[in-house]
């Protein structure tokens, strides 16, 4: 049997997956691993914090289909736990690659630094947060363990964990030619044919339909099938907040994002008022359904998940989305005359939104409108949880919008810009983030600059945690005011602006878009500033009370 090393085998697999770098912070238990990866042409891009490295790798995975965060043992690995939790909740194949104390030096249970209860504490934590774990403590199965973890991650679209003892890095290990292709959920072809007939019968017998597309469309690489289905049958498409960009929002059939009562009225009417609603790969969570303000009649619902299809109250088992949607598209092409009976009339949107600034103080609504007018296909949007995420439901994004939209971990978007910018260098990341979240991970602006990702950061500064103030206000929602517009000067590159008015905001956005360096715009808002989306949500929740 041929021999290899752990770093060489990892890199071989990463390159097969289209991954050409990791993100992370080195420590002594991971020094040799990092050195070997770098020496072999696989760099680990340094961030300011391990959690930020995890967010960057998560965002990279959302674009490329797989991401790697590398860290040291204990103090590094446990700081990545929150990023792993985010990846589990939102079904992202994020690999946590951790250095660890050597196999030999663990003998006798010595009290080595970074150890907690015992040497397996970190492993037990990640058993709760990942779909597969591998500790590479034998040269005979190290390669097959790597392959098993990667294959399971790709099959489930969940994070995985690999631990590399530092004395194992240069072992000669048995090579592996195992197949790392995902083992997709099984298909009952007879049930699938029945499900497709049931769906087409529903569409034929009703006057209007809509599609609600979710994260699993992107995770299973089904964007082209979604587009074909919508355009062949003339069905308008709304996406979930976890799937923005899987269907072009500025297309004539694009509705934007459906988020229950948070969404604009015309989106709510088209989705909730459709005679038939096809929910394709949507994670049915509280936040993706507008804190459960979505009003969807299950008699009219067709629900396609990663495992089953439900039409009304009939469930077709073992009909997974990855097989069902392409087969439905094929059947729909044969049934294309049905397109004429679908009511697709809705207000067309301009090819490019316009914004006319006036000399008045900034509001959340007008800030979003200004930003939308400057975005185009050259940009990727990143939205941090809170008002940055909610306010953007009134925006038609030109490409993709990435967010921790279900797990909702604050501080995600700034380091995620590094991941998105690295994974898709043809598009410039534009980040919208609140001042509270920016105070958590804002230093990763420096990481972006250091790695030549010249992102634009728009910081919504309302003096604290504005999303929570309408729920229960108090001094716990107030935070120190930081002059973050000076951060580019601190890191020695880029430009910064503080803008109080619409005219200043529009000018700063215009200059930032035209520049080729890191830019940071601090948008001053009133303490009680609130987006129309948050106002709509408050009214809906009050009506339910």
Annotate the PLM regions.
Residues 1-336, 454-457:
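N-terminal alpha/beta PP-like core and its mobile active-site loop of ThDP/TPP-dependent enzymes
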Residues 1-2, 137-140, 176, 296-385, ...:
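Phosphate/pyrophosphate-binding active-site segments
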Residues 52-53, 79, 122, 324, ...:
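Catalytic-loop motifs flanking and including active-site residues across diverse enzymes
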Residues 93, 107-117, 390-545:
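Thiamine diphosphate
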């Amino acid at each position: 049997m041929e021999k290899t090393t752990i770093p060489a085998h990892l890199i071989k697999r990463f390159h097969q997956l289209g991954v050409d770098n990791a993100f992370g912070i080195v420590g002594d238990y991971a020094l040799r691993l990092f050195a070997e990866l770098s020496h072999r042409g696989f760099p680990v891009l340094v961030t300011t914090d391990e959690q930020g490295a995890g967010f960057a790798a998560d965002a990279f995975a959302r674009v490329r289909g797989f991401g790697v965060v590398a860290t040291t043992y204990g103090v590094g690995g446990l700081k990545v736990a929150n990023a792993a939790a985010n990846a589990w909740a939102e079904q992202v194949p994020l690999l946590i690659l951790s250095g660890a104390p050597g196999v030999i030096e663990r003998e006798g249970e010595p009290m080595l630094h970074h150890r907690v209860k015992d040497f397996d504490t970190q492993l037990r934590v990640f058993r709760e947060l990942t779909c597969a774990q591998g500790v590479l403590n034998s040269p005979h199965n190290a390669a097959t363990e790597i392959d098993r973890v990667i294959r399971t991650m790709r099959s489930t679209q969940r994070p995985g964990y690999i631990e590399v003892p530092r004395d194992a890095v240069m072992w000669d290990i048995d090579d592996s030619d195992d197949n790392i292709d995902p083992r997709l959920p099984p298909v009952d072809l007879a049930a699938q044919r029945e499900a497709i007939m049931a769906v087409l019968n529903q569409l034929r017998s009703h006057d209007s339909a809509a599609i609600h597309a979710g994260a699993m469309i992107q995770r299973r690489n089904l964007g082209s099938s979604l587009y074909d289905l919508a355009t062949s049958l003339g069905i308008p498409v709304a996406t979930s907040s976890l799937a923005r960009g899987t269907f072009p929002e500025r297309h004539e059939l694009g509705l934007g994002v459906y988020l229950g009562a948070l969404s604009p009225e015309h989106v709510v009417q088209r989705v909730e008022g459709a005679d038939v609603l096809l929910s394709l790969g949507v994670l049915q969570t509280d936040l993706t359904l507008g804190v459960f303000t979505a009003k969807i009649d299950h008699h009219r619902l067709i629900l396609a998940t990663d495992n089953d299809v439900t039409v009304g109250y009939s469930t077709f088992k073992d009909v997974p989305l990855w097989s069902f949607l392409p087969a439905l598209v094929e059947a729909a092409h044969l049934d294309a005359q049905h397109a004429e009976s679908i009511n697709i009339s809705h207000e067309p949107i301009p090819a490019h939104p316009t914004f006319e600034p006036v000399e008045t103080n900034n509001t959340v609504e007008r800030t979003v409108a200004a930003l939308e007018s400057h975005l185009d296909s050259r940009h990727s949007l990143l939205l941090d949880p809170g008002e940055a995420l909610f306010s953007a439901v009134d925006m038609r994004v030109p490409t993709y919008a990435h967010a921790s939209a279900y797990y909702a971990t604050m501080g995600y978007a700034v380091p995620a810009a590094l991941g998105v910018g690295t994974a898709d260098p043809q598009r410039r990341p534009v980040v919208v983030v609140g001042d509270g979240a920016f105070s958590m991970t804002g230093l990763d602006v420096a990481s972006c600059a250091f790695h030549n990702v010249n992102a634009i950061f728009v910081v919504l500064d309302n003096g604290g945690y504005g999303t929570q103030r309408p729920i229960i206000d108090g001094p716990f929602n107030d935070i120190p005011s930081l002059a973050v517009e000076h951060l580019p000067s601190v890191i020695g590159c880029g430009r910064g602006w503080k803008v109080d008015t619409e005219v200043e905001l529009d000018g700063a956005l215009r200059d930032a878009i035209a520049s080729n360096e890191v830019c940071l715009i601090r948008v001053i808002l009133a303490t009680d500033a609130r987006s129309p989306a948050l106002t709509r949500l408050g009214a809906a929740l009050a009506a339910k009370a």
